[in-house]
C-alpha cells in the first residue's frame, strides 16, 4: 500500500483506533495522529502504532517562541515519528529552531523526522483570511509567501490545499514536499473544509502526500474505501 497516502486517525482514543486498524491487519500504513488522539493517549499511542509497523505523521502544529518549539521538537523526535509540523506564521526563527530540536532529539542512526509547515488551514477561505486574520494578499499569494519562507528556513515542505500545489512547485521547486489534506471522494460531504479535492485531482495537481480521514475512517468498509482512494491517487488498479 502507498506510503504517500496518509490516513488521518481522527479518533477520540486508542479503543477506536484499535477497532479501525483491525480492518488493516498485516498492512503497514502511514497514519496521522492529531491533537485529539495525542492529547488523550499521550506518547503511548505512538509506541503502539510503531509496534504495529505504521509510519506516523504527528500533527500538532506547533506555534510558540523559538526556544519552546525547539525543546518540544527535541521531545517529539525522540518518539521516532516520521513527520511533524509547525505553523509557518511562527516565523523563520521558530522554524529554524524546530529543525535544531529535531536534529538534537532524533534517535541514533536515524534521520530526523520530515518537518513541514502549515500555510493556511484548509478551513480558511480567502474572505476569512482577509477579514479575520488581516492578510490582504490573495490566498495563493499568502500560501506562496509562507512556503518560500518555510523553504528558506530549512524545512522540507508545507501543508497546503491541492489548489496551491502548482504555484508552490513554481516558487519552491519539485523537491519541496506538499502535504495536502481536504481530500474527499466525489461522493462525500466536504464537512468543515473549504478547499477540497478528490485523490485523482490531487495527483493531477502534483501533491507529494495526501491526507484522507472521513472518506476512509467513516466508511462502512474502511479497507475497500482505502483501496478506492489509493486507486484514484495512484492511477492504478489495486
UniProtKB/Swiss-Prot annotation:
Keywords: Decarboxylase, Lyase, Pyrimidine biosynthesis. It catalyses: orotidine 5'-phosphate + H(+) = UMP + CO2. InterPro entries: Aldolase_TIM, OMPdecase, OMPdecase_AS, OMPdecase_bac, OMPdeCOase_dom, RibuloseP-bd_barrel. The keyword Ubl conjugation does not apply. The keyword Lyase applies. GO terms for cellular component: cytosol. Its EC number is 4.1.1.23. It comes from the Bacteria. The active site is at residue 61. Pathway: Pyrimidine metabolism; UMP biosynthesis via de novo pathway; UMP from orotate: step 2/2. It is an enzyme of class 4 (lyase). GO terms for molecular function: orotidine-5'-phosphate decarboxylase activity. One of its GO terms (biological process) is 'de novo' UMP biosynthetic process. Substrate binds at residues 10, 32, 59-68, 122, 184, 193, 213-214. Homodimer. Belongs to the OMP decarboxylase family. Type 1 subfamily. Catalyzes the decarboxylation of orotidine 5'-monophosphate (OMP) to uridine 5'-monophosphate (UMP). This is Orotidine 5'-phosphate decarboxylase.
Amino acid at each position: 500500500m502507498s506510503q504517500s497516502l496518509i490516513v488521518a486517525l481522527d479518533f477520540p482514543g486508542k479503543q477506536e483506533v484499535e477497532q479501525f486498524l483491525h480492518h488493516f491487519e498485516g498492512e503497514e500504513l502511514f497514519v496521522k495522529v492529531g491533537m485529539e488522539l495525542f492529547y488523550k493517549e499521550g506518547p503511548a499511542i505512538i509506541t503502539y502504532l510503531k509496534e504495529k509497523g505504521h509510519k506516523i505523521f504527528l500533527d500538532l502544529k506547533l506555534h510558540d517562541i523559538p526556544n519552546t518549539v525547539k525543546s518540544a521538537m527535541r521531545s517529539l523526535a525522540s518518539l521516532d515519528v516520521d513527520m511533524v509540523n509547525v505553523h509557518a506564521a511562527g516565523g523563520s526563527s521558530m522554524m529554524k529552531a524546530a529543525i535544531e530540536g529535531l536534529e538534537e532529539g532524533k534517535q541514533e542512526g536515524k534521520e530526523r523526522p520530515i518537518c513541514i509547515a502549515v500555510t493556511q488551514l484548509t478551513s480558511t477561505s480567502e474572505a476569512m483570511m482577509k477579514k479575520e486574520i488581516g492578510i490582504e494578499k490573495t490566498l495563493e499569494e499568502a500560501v506562496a509567501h509562507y512556503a518560500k519562507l518555510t523553504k528558506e528556513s530549512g524545512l522540507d515542505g508545507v501543508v497546503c490545499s491541492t489548489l496551491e500545489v502548482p504555484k508552490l512547485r513554481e516558487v519552491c521547486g519539485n523537491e519541496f514536499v506538499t502535504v495536502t489534506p481536504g481530500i474527499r471522494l466525489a461522493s462525500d460531504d466536504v464537512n468543515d473544509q473549504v478547499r477540497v479535492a478528490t485523490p485523482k485531482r490531487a495527483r493531477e495537481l502534483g501533491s507529494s502526500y495526501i491526507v484522507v480521514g472521513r472518506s476512509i475512517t467513516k466508511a462502512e468498509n474502511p479497507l475497500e474505501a482505502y483501496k478506492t482512494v489509493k486507486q484514484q491517487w495512484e492511477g492504478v488498479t489495486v
